[in-house]
Amino acid sequence: MAFLALGINHKTASVDVRERVAFTPEQLVDALQQLCRLTSSREAAILSTCNRSELYIEQDHLSADAVLQWLADYHRLSLDELRASAYVHEEHDAVKHMMRVASGLDSLVLGEPQILGQMKSAYAVAREAGTVGPLLGRLFQATFSAAKQVRTDTAIGENPVSVAFAAVSLAKQIFADLGRSQALLIGAGETITLVARHLHEQGVRRIVVANRTLERASILAEQFGAHAVLLADIPQELANSDIVISSTASQLPILGKGAVESALKQRRHKPIFMVDIAVPRDIETEVGELDDVYLYTVDDLHDVVAENLKSRQGAAQAAEELVTVGAEDFMLRLRELAAVDVLKAYRQQSERLRDEELQKAQRLLANGGNPEDVLAQLARGLTNKLLHAPSVQLKKLSAEGRVDALAMAQELFALNEGSTDKSPQ
């Protein structure tokens, strides 16, 4: 048995290459079955995300070249082009790599939790394809356990390390229950999209997306069950908004002190939490002087992110230690597993010899044999039969000068030097 983990990720390959090596969900089952059919892979799973495409494989004998060739052929790449971005991990390193990936230690955003769910999906698809057996299945379960322990025993996932997530985390500190809050998001770019996703996941009661073009706002709003409006509609929406997060490319402020003052009066001075992620700023700085307004800028968030990233990096050291222990423990149990078949066969052989001697003893007793003599004969016969094959093999190994094998036999049978009985002087 041998494990392989190979592929490309955001650190080794450009977006262009990652796009070309990616698998669509519809391709995965057929790709897995083809991979096992055309290479020497007995078990296989594929993890394909925007940041990585990786193959996790169990083989009788390591054959990474054949798998890389298959991957290149499948995506119509030259092998040299793929090799320039690919990495290969074998055996213990493959196990450790899987555990690091599932724990978020190899992610673009250190400690991000989504990768574990993606890993579980990869396992589920491989089971559907029938390409996961007992060994790779055990590795996945050990990987999930290691990732869970990292989440439980370290702080690697506790602090936000993206501006969008930091903004939502600050909102949670201001409002105890986001499920009762309404959010107004200004803009429709990547950052606001991430903010919308985080707010949606936190169960915010209502999200309104305001943008210069209604079409862009509507596309974003549809993803999260939100409501789309134009920038001109912001004054009407402000009075109902507990959370306002803005990130546009406007060169002039979009929200002024007067509009916010008016909204606060309508809200009877119920607090508004505001985050201005834009550069230049979307919200006039004077807004922050108003009572009942909590205004944060992108610089405030970067300070939070930097501090939290430092915290995560400290937690990552502890996480790496847990992963190392997890990988070593798995490999130890795997090596122990290799002895199971041998032990099972030896037990079956011993039980057959025991049954033969027991039947012989029962016949002797039935014919009136002396019980003590029969028991003694049973013990001698069973001992001789159990020792016969090992004795023959040990003599053969000794004749061949296999001192190492003799030493191993002494360890196997727990024989200590000078352990033979000696008559008292």
Swiss-Prot record:
Keywords: NADP, Oxidoreductase, Porphyrin biosynthesis. The active site is at residue 50. Substrate binds at residues 49-52, 107, 112-114, 118. InterPro entries: 4pyrrol_synth_GluRdtase, 4pyrrol_synth_GluRdtase_dimer, 4pyrrol_synth_GluRdtase_N, GluRdtase_CS, GluRdtase_dimer_dom_sf, GluRdtase_N_sf, NAD(P)-bd_dom_sf, Shikm_DH/Glu-tRNA_Rdtase. Pathway: Porphyrin-containing compound metabolism; protoporphyrin-IX biosynthesis; 5-aminolevulinate from L-glutamyl-tRNA(Glu): step 1/2. The record marks 97 as: Important for activity. One of its GO terms (molecular function) is glutamyl-tRNA reductase activity. Its EC number is 1.2.1.70. Pfam families: GlutR_dimer (PF00745), GlutR_N (PF05201), Shikimate_DH (PF01488). Signal peptide: none annotated. Possesses an unusual extended V-shaped dimeric structure with each monomer consisting of three distinct domains arranged along a curved 'spinal' alpha-helix. The N-terminal catalytic domain specifically recognizes the glutamate moiety of the substrate. The second domain is the NADPH-binding domain, and the third C-terminal domain is responsible for dimerization. During catalysis, the active site Cys acts as a nucleophile attacking the alpha-carbonyl group of tRNA-bound glutamate with the formation of a thioester intermediate between enzyme and glutamate, and the concomitant release of tRNA(Glu). The thioester intermediate is finally reduced by direct hydride transfer from NADPH, to form the product GSA. This is Glutamyl-tRNA reductase. It comes from Pseudomonas putida (strain GB-1).
